[in-house]
Amino acid sequence: MKRGGRDSDRNSSEEGTAEKSKKLRTTNEHSQTCDWGNLLQDIILQVFKYLPLLDRAHASQVCRNWNQVFHMPDLWRCFEFELNQPATSYLKATHPELIKQIIKRHSNHLQYVSFKVDSSKESAEAACDILSQLVNCSLKTLGLISTARPSFMDLPKSHFISALTVVFVNSKSLSSLKIDDTPVDDPSLKVLVANNSDTLKLLKMSSCPHVSPAGILCVADQCHGLRELALNYHLLSDELLLALSSEKHVRLEHLRIDVVSENPGQTHFHTIQKSSWDAFIRHSPKVNLVMYFFLYEEEFDPFFRYEIPATHLYFGRSVSKDVLGRVGMTCPRLVELVVCANGLRPLDEELIRIAERCKNLSAIGLGECEVSCSAFVEFVKMCGGRLSQLSIMEEVLIPDQKYSLEQIHWEVSKHLGRVWFPDMMPTW
């Protein structure tokens, strides 16, 4: 009996020990699976890439391992500085302490940088202050964006140029530069070309009054890899188009031209020779030529007098029937047409002519214009299903003997191959 009792006690003891070992093993396994701090840094890095900066900063406080990942160079290649003054903007600004940390610890990691500034001069000055400190980084892209009026233009030109030149000198592989509405000038463009001519592919510099045609020509002559360019019409010249058409230059993919007049009758618009356009389109047959017009009616005389390779036309002010008629005759490559206003004379003949001659037209928008319902249906019928975007206010369409406003939506839908309704003006 005693021996049997001892065996029973031994078995009970062994079972208890096994149970404790099992619980301990389970606890250890559970603690290992739940120890987020031991995750591989590569895994944490991939997760951090999908988090907004603020969430990433909070997560970096979990443990030392996560904090190390937070400061890895891969997370600081791309950054957007938002510089706003509380009195002039409702948008959140990048915290000053974060800016200090970026300059101190990550300036040499930055490659893709943009600055968004509000309308205040202080924000533009802050952007220049940051730019002037980027002496240890080689940027690949830089964008200076004014979210309201162009506040960079309020700065002394020398102050802005000094800050921008720091980036041009230290960046040896700049491929994209967006500096619309800034006081950049010809000498600073020469610095850009001297240091980045082999890598520059995109340059946006609309509304840069201190740049001359010679300044932009210098860029075109040296930056043979340039594929996208945006500038004002006063910088466009026959020499520039020929430089962009040289054998050394790659084929241009996108050329945007802003044709702007602030005061009627005070701006002279020169004429580009047809031979220059012909050479340009032979060299870059697939280029998108985008033109924005903000002119008064009497200033359109130099334009649309012969065939040009425009693909996208936007008229921001009232444009006459005569000009739109010339568009139909001179823009066979037209893909998109937007007319904000025309007046009270119906555009029936002009639309029909555009449909006949512009075989690639796929998008059209009409604002304060007038078109008879019959002419509009005929226009849609001629263009057919290729009209992927058709934005017409209901007030534009004038009922006639053939179609009422109720009937037109069915007829247009039939020719488009999809349901279509005219746009409605909000009641508020």
Curated annotation (Swiss-Prot):
Region (Disordered): 1-27
Signal peptide extent: none
Organism the protein comes from: Homo sapiens (Human)
Biological role: Substrate-recognition component of the SCF(FBXL3) E3 ubiquitin ligase complex involved in circadian rhythm function. Plays a key role in the maintenance of both the speed and the robustness of the circadian clock oscillation. The SCF(FBXL3) complex mainly acts in the nucleus and mediates ubiquitination and subsequent degradation of CRY1 and CRY2. Activity of the SCF(FBXL3) complex is counteracted by the SCF(FBXL21) complex.
BP terms from Gene Ontology: entrainment of circadian clock by photoperiod; protein destabilization; protein ubiquitination; regulation of circadian rhythm; rhythmic process; SCF-dependent proteasomal ubiquitin-dependent protein catabolic process
Main localization, broad class: nucleus
Post-translational modification: Undergoes autophagy-mediated degradation in the liver in a time-dependent manner.
Known partners and oligomeric status: Part of the SCF (SKP1-CUL1-F-box) E3 ubiquitin-protein ligase complex SCF(FBXL3) composed of CUL1, SKP1, RBX1 and FBXL3. Interacts with CRY1 and CRY2 (phosphorylated). Interacts with HDAC3. Interacts with KDM8.
Protein name (database record): F-box/LRR-repeat protein 3
Record flagged with keyword Nucleus: yes
Pfam families: F-box-like
Source species taxonomy: Eukaryota, Metazoa, Chordata, Craniata, Vertebrata
Effect of residue 358 to A: Loss of binding with CRY1
Cited SUPFAM superfamilies: F-box domain (SSF81383), RNI-like (SSF52047)
Residue ranges of every copy of the F-box domain listed in the record: 34-81
InterPro entries tied to this protein: F-box-like_dom_sf, F-box_dom, LRR_dom_sf
